[in-house]
From Swiss-Prot:
The keyword Cell membrane applies. Gustatory receptor-like proteins are divergent proteins which do not belong to the canonical gustatory receptor or olfactory receptor families but display some structural similarity. They are predicted to be ligand-gated seven transmembrane domain ion channels. The chain crosses the membrane at residues 14-34, 43-63, 73-93, 127-147, 162-182, 252-272, 278-298. It comes from the Eukaryota. It comes from Drosophila melanogaster (Fruit fly). The keyword Transmembrane applies. GO terms for molecular function: ligand-gated channel activity. Pfam families: 7tm_7. Its main location: membrane. Signal peptide: none annotated. It is found in: Cell membrane. Residues 35-42, 94-126, 183-251, 299-371 are extracellular. This is Gustatory receptor-like 65a.
């Protein structure tokens, strides 16, 4: 098997860096055991995450309790705080399941590497998606800094700095949980992409056998049996990838629901009366579009029909024909769609949400100008 190339080495280090930051922020409660080559729960990180959660809850309760006298003006902050707190609690309670899912993903990735005959699962497009996820995180934090600095005269300099740092830490912990979800989806996209390459390789081998002059020779039948066995392994591997994808989508559906609500809040509450407010709305829309793009890419990569279009050996071997039919049947019934509580996150829903959000932002702008 070939060695890990520079691109894959950098991508793996980038993913481990994201995990390290989540551990520092008290989001992740698991560590990677290099000897056992698996993830495991850490009692210290779980205790540390609980302390961070308690501090976060106290900070949000104190800050929101002082705003109830003017709830009509600050309700977006209250709702956003509740969303962040609920997501953190949900993540801590479900931390054992995410460790199980991560270990299953590691086992599947090793099987895919064996099928592909090389350890280089990630390609440049997957690294770019990860970098875009990091860019969205940093861009959201930078926008908060801009809005807070714009209203810095409401506090003295020291108090404003402390509050700004706490707000950034709270927001960072929430954005890191969404970023972890995106990273897992990108890994699944890379896995499906590698399965495409394996399928095309089998397809090309079958095309070469189809052009063989003697289709009844013993050597030919041995090669057909070998390809049939490889195809059956591909079927089982694709089933495993499909099931782990469904479990990950189901596990994080509550996180995605909260992320969508949090991303839409500015359109219902913020008035684009200056450049900072307008930039915040644009960045919120871009973040939602990027998340939907990840969903669309995952749904598209889970389809393998285009990789099977050149399987022509089925006319010469009935058992191979049944194997290919099983793979095609699996393709028809096992297509990934990202759903949350029965609602499919497709482009139609995205267009509806963005249209409603743009209308609300326009109405808020008109009310501000009228006042």
């Amino acid at each position: 098997m070939r060695e890990v190339n520079l691109l894959n080495r950098f991508t793996r280090q980038f993913l481990f860096l994201i995990v390290l930051v989540t551990q520092i922020c008290g989001v992740a409660t698991f560590v990677y055991n290099s000897k056992a080559q698996c993830f495991r729960q850490s009692g210290f990180l779980r205790f540390y995450s609980s302390l961070v959660l308690i501090f976060l809850a106290l900070f949000l309760i104190v800050t929101t309790s002082k705003m109830f006298h003017n709830l009509q003006a600050v309700w977006p902050y209250v709702v956003g705080s509740v969303i962040i707190l609920v997501v953190r609690i949900h993540g801590l309670l479900e931390s054992a399941e995410i460790v199980e899912l991560l270990n299953q993903m590691l086992r599947i990735m090793r099987q895919v590497n064996l099928m592909a005959r090389h350890p280089n699962l990630f390609r440049l497009k997957h690294l770019l998606l990860l970098l875009l996820a990091l860019q969205n995180l940093l861009r959201s934090l930078n926008t908060i800094v801009g809005i807070s600095n714009h209203s810095a005269e409401a506090y003295d300099s020291f108090l404003n700095s402390v509050i700004l740092l706490i707000i950034l830490a709270v927001l960072l912990s929430f954005l890191l949980q969404i970023t972890i979800n995106i990273c897992l989806f990108v890994v699944l996209i890379a896995t499906y992409s590698e399965l495409h390459h394996c399928t095309r390789r089998i397809s090309n081998d079958m095309d070469k056998l189809r052009l063989h002059s003697v289709h009844e020779s013993g050597q030919f039948m041995v090669l057909v049996k070998q390809l049939q066995g490889i195809t059956e392994k591909l079927i089982r591997l694709r089933q495993n990838v499909f099931h782990i994808t469904v479990r990950i989508i189901r596990h994080f559906r509550f996180h995605w629901l909260c992320a969508i609500i949090y991303g839409l809040l500015p359109f219902f509450s913020l008035t684009a009366k200056d450049q900072n407010g307008f930039n915040f709305l644009i960045i919120s829309a871009l973040n939602i579009i990027f998340q939907w793009t990840i969903f669309a890419i995952l749904s598209r990569e889970s389809r393998i029909t285009r990789s099977l279009c050149t399987f022509h050996l089925t006319n010469y071997h009935k058992e191979t024909a049944r194997t290919i039919d099983e793979l095609l049947h699996q393709e028809i019934w096992e297509r990934i769609t990202v759903t949350i509580y029965g609602n499919t996150l497709d482009t139609k829903l995205l267009f509806k949400l963005l249209s409603i959000s743009a209308f609300c932002a326009f109405v808020n702008r008109l009310e501000y100008l009228h006042i």
